[in-house]
Amino acid sequence: MKILSIVLIALIICSISICTEAFGLIDVKCSASRECWVACKKVTGSGQGKCQNNQCRCY
């Protein structure tokens, strides 16, 4: 039981790490969300993104 809980915690930590690296701010300046769609498509493979503080954030 103790080993199972340790493995579960390790799995959760690894999952969080992978998710935070995959999505986030990219080095593209913007003034509107539509400017981020093509850049996010190139970086993450998904066109989902928005302009936040004059920088693109991809999802």
Curated annotation (Swiss-Prot):
One Pfam short name: Toxin_2
Residues the record marks as site: Aromatic residue of the functional dyad: 59
Main location: secreted
Localization: Secreted
PROSITE patterns in UniProt: SCORP_SHORT_TOXIN
Site (Basic residue of the functional dyad): 50
Keyword annotations from UniProtKB, A to Z: Disulfide bond, Ion channel impairing toxin, Neurotoxin, Potassium channel impairing toxin, Secreted, Signal, Toxin, Voltage-gated potassium channel impairing toxin
GO MF term list: ion channel inhibitor activity; potassium channel regulator activity; toxin activity
A GO CC annotation given for this chain: extracellular region
Record function comment: Weak inhibitor of voltage-gated potassium channel hKv1.3/KCNA3.
Signal peptide: 1-22
Protein name, as recorded: Potassium channel toxin alpha-KTx 16.4
Family, as annotated: Belongs to the short scorpion toxin superfamily. Potassium channel inhibitor family. Alpha-KTx 16 subfamily.
Something else known: Negative results: does not inhibit large conductance calcium-activated potassium channels (KCa1.1/KCNMA1).
Entry's free-text remark on domains: Has the structural arrangement of an alpha-helix connected to a beta-sheet by disulfide bonds (CSalpha/beta).
Disulphide connectivity of cysteines: 30-51, 36-56, 40-58
Gene3D superfamilies with a match to the protein in the record: Knottin, scorpion toxin-like (3.30.30.10)
Tissue localization of expression: Expressed by the venom gland.
